[in-house]
């Protein structure tokens, strides 16, 4: 603002003037200083661009590009102020010495204009080295800069800045480069003019001149004396449009500062980018008007298209707006082109009155003026026409309305009362226009442009995702998949009860008998040769293993198996427990799934079962196409040759390392005892016994994968500089982690003990002698709040980025741990490969990130400062590090000082590995309990809350109490509801118990404790041992008071339950609520029944129960036990009730929850209230839900009752969701297909298929005769004569069947479900035996709450609730009603679209009650079938598309057998229904349900809106289990009727089926089944065929059917609202995503299948690209309906 008048004022007279002066002073104090000399026009430009910032002009320098440089400096200050220590990309040479806060700079080798900049760079300071390297082509002198570019550099940095240096990189390239640097934030300044969105041309604005040639854009600002900016157009467009990057390197891009078209973009690495639409140019001062005349060109026989040669003219927005307002409001008589030109000439002159600008004016060329007049005149003509038409139509409508009589007005009034919401103007017809029409306008306004596009990164995620899903793919093939298993946690503490009203049973629960296999067994390698071949081991290793024999001593105790393997002169130990981690040679992690009761083990694709037999131990190995049995005899084997054993171990180690270097995902790391052992190939807890233990040597032949170990890793980590100070002290409150039981025997002597002996080495193997030490699986001892961990074990088991070596002064190979590093990484000791030194620490990346650091020698001098520095100097890095205790070996540093030094000088996430001696010291000196820091602000707020409390009667005991800042130590035992937290407290451990309610106080006092409520306890907790029960629910100020006053404090509670509530709403409770970290978690509940545990498993994933009650939730029964309500208002209406909040911590045998209407918001918003209400009872919970609040969240009494009535059980099943991935652009052949014209593509499709525009919209075929059943008709069959559609083209490529009207419904009912059913009475055994080729005997199926949850989830996703599910009463028609609907979609065809004479298609819907009754069973049966399918057989859509495509591609020599079922639903009869019931009986479904299903299917009534049909048998394509039983019947018919040779792939989905084989023939029993059931099979056998919307091409894969997809789009109605157009765009985008990498292959294959030209498919893909871009054109058509129906003949049976 202009402030001179206030600055010169002699005095301040009013408050307004005082405020204005303060505003002016503030604006001037924060003004931008402009130093260059500027012209008057440049000053105006800068003032307009920099608004609302105040500018102060102090000219003192001459700049070549003053406007850009001022903007650049302003944005640079913003970026550098927020980035801190950062990495800079493409820094200007002049800025190097001025910014010491940059840790690294990325440059490119200078070319062209950059050479001049380097010549003028400073010759002193840090810039001198950069200048010398740039101009002489020398390598970088230090790590502060490089000339590899941003994409080629890998220097780690968390934050970066790029000032006008990313114009030649796309957002995807920047995302990958940021990931390579480990960068989380990047501030990028970019120049993004809006003209790059326009066609090529020359654009002149008030600020700059822009020349756009289609590929590059050159921008020159006003007054520039040097060359302008030259950027790539495609990259600029990407930066303008993109707001996020998806893929393996996701980013969100936010525009945080803008000056004109100069933007600062903040790129942030985020795991799940969310939509971030933005308007880039809301303050644009130009509107771009299109000229209908293009620029002059060269003569040509064929004129070029206007779209590529048209030009735009930049017109000031105020000129265009005023011109539009003037022309639109002119009188009809006065409106003419000359008057518009006169007005435009007038407003184009600049007019000033004194210092006031009355008219800004404009200087324009003749071409621009002509374009503006033309565009304005035509646009105003269009608007005036619309105005005239609207008024004319409105007047005619008003005349009709005023002429209406009383009866008509009364009818309209009644109709409006009962009709929809009133929308003004709906009675008028709307004017429809398209984007490319003349009436759509001639101008583009940047102010209204909105962008929110995502750019996929160029990573190879397709291969990575496919490999990562290999384990689950093996499960689909019928193998065991245990990738979801995690190690089981033990229960910590006593298992008591927290309420004396509940007592456990005196009868011990029964346990299943576990067979004991303890003993000694002989394991010859020859017995496992098939397993070695399945593991794909080299022949050398297989031959060596077959020559060896081992003795395995097995000890089985408490679900754990310990094996001692004697192989030659070596002894190995392994420990098999459930959840044990298996070592791998890749990034994949495998956990062992071990069930001692079932005698099974599994991990990855391998599994085994074992059993004791008379001959010994019988083990069955399954996996990777292997099914092998081996029997191991008891006894002791002769000792194998030690030389052979050593050679086998060495060869096996070399194979593991070779596989590690070339593995993307990896497999198991094979140990000797894992291959020559009972339970091959598993070897968890690998121990190689030796006599000289030191940290790490014991794993010389063991390798736990770390991504940075792989030489071929594309993202090898780099070192960086510490961006934050080290962790200050031990006061960083660690969190105590419950230690796992040790997996190794008693520790060996400490590392300082002398070596006893060396194992013998084989002279024949040529392998040097290597000392083998005891290797133990690492054991977690402690976890700190910052994520750091302390382990007992070998640091070589760590997955950290860096490993720290306890080196010597010269960093040469030595003894102890340094020797182990040299054995593993000899190249890491090469001083020439050290990339950085920090003090005495040396950093290397060869062959993996390692830090060599030497501790002080305490044998000579005790030097604590050097010991601190030894750890501190290892923190100049990015990523985590694994440490040993430095100096505690040879240099004799005590364990305590070394541990304290590490604790004070490490980074979050680091790991410390202790040998057994140090581990025992650590356990004896474990860090203290976690601490809570009370800050001054928290203490002040708590004291304010205490003062408010002390003024009340309840809180008067708190008077005078205060909370002071400080640190409080505490112990916090958290657990699931009913886990016995309070029962674990004994009277000897505590002096005072603080509880939140009187009920809990009385319960504690009955147990003999001194219990008090929070306010009263303020008098007695000082200096006492205090236990605080339900600590999270205590008011936080009282909780802090008691924790600070107590001598020791032990907190009990559940963080997931109701916290302290701020009833008075002063805002103090949430402000001081402490963040308490549980020191232990208890997961076993002794209160909650099984069904309650299932409901709350989302909040407590590891919950288990000892309760024997399976079902405790009941609806509609009388109230029993304690009544619970949600709100205080409901208590008076329910005497004796308590609120859910008050009942927290209590236990009742029976409870009744009463949900009132006022609790709706509380139930939907507070998860904690629901958890507390659910977990108060032990036996029974009665729900009284009159308002239906629980039904609103998807659960009702009918659903639960019917589920248990149908035989459902509490339990777990695998989910039915199939993981699917979106293909990323690894080849991206789709990018070669530009968008094409929609009209030409559909016309070419019509020419190729021979289709022509149809004169009718639909055909009502003649209604066939009703052959069976009874049809109910309405008195009138109303029809419509015409249909209005919004279509993509007037040529339809689908069968034009009947629309949804009465005659069409009748024709469909009669034609599809009124045909006579041919019954076939025969045994199902033959067909079931044939079906066993694909679906073996299923066995009993368990229906669990998992299927019930999936059913409810599907209902909620469809917008349904539980109100439609009724109690199972067959007398109620609503329970058994089957509703019929007419389908609108028609089938794509290459033949005749009209003269087919086929009736329409219908879909039925069973009642929600039957769906809820049978749905869980059908889901469970479907899961059982999927688990039994052989390899190569695909069911429905329960597979990933890439897996199916890979299977088809692998069957290169096969032909495609295709069967087309005609009238598939209509031909199903009593035989197909009997087969379904037989399979249900085979699965263990209750007989009552089977008979009910048979009854519903054998005789039914289809209820249409006005018609109904009583019929028999058939199949309805909408009932529960439609896909399941249709697919099973399809499988049964195909397997029984045809025999296939060399079957490779078979796929079945409903009535569609294909089989890839070399030859087929009809089986002998086929004719009987076909004739008996009246089947209509049409078989085809060709090289390529169609299946379920894809083209099946053996050897190539399953490719999307472009022709069929495009043809089906022509039949649908895409209007009248914009929602349908959005659905079209989304559907087409999803389809194009499947074409990303196979577009060119689709062109060749699809054209061959349909016999069309490849150019058609190419054109169709381009058309789909245009539709996905939102450029679809719709045509409104009104076509008649051809009615060919005749009289319906009914025959009553």
UniProtKB/Swiss-Prot annotation:
Chain residue ranges for the region called Methyltransferase: 60-240
Region (Disordered): 716-769
Zinc among keywords: yes
One GO CC term on file: host cell perinuclear region of cytoplasm
Binding positions for Zn(2+) per the UniProt entry: 671, 673, 686
Stretches for region Hinge: 712-778
Biological process annotations from GO: DNA-templated transcription; methylation; mRNA modification; proteolysis; RNA processing; viral protein processing; viral RNA genome replication
Catalysed reactions listed for this entry: RNA(n) + a ribonucleoside 5'-triphosphate = RNA(n+1) + diphosphate; GTP + S-adenosyl-L-methionine = N(7)-methyl-GTP + S-adenosyl-L-homocysteine
Role of this protein: Methyltransferase: Displays a capping enzyme activity. This function is necessary since all viral RNAs are synthesized in the cytoplasm, and host capping enzymes are restricted to the nucleus. The enzymatic reaction involves a covalent link between 7-methyl-GMP and the methyltransferase, whereas eukaryotic capping enzymes form a covalent complex only with GMP. Methyltransferase catalyzes transfer of a methyl group from S-adenosylmethionine to GTP and GDP to yield m(7)GTP or m(7)GDP. GDP is a better substrate than GTP. Y-domain: Indispensable for virus replication.
Protein's name according to its UniProt entry: Non-structural polyprotein pORF1
